[in-house]
Amino acid sequence: MEQKTTLIVRGGGDLASGVIHRLYKCGYQVLVLECERPSAIRRKVSFGEAVYDGTSYVEEVTGRLITNIKECPKVWAAGEIPILIDEAGESVKSLKPAAVIDAILAKKNLGTTRDMASLTIALGPGFTAQKDVDYVVETQRGHNLGRVIEKGTA
């Protein structure tokens, strides 16, 4: 059986869910780390809703709430995305993912550091590329939306 690359996405809101969905469709094993009481503007397209409902669905992809990181292989084997309540990101240490993507969109860094994985990416303001994370992605509407920032801030 082929070993898939594991990635962690911090945050399961609507924008994060777009990233999660795309990574899943590209064949990555994605673990979503969510807070205890997530909020999202577009709740029907947010994997974070699994925290409340046990499951969430975004374009026919299922997110499933788990209570322990040891449940990940079973959920991945079912073709689903595990959602774990782990606001502090403690499970990053034990899972050792290839990349950590911070998609919390808190407009400030809530603890993501470059030493969490070989590749770290953050969405939106509050991060400095090459200091806090490797890359920052611009999330503000306009001509620079989606731009990858290699040095500096969004």
Stretches with model-predicted labels:
Residues E2-A154:
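Well-ordered secondary-structure scaffolds
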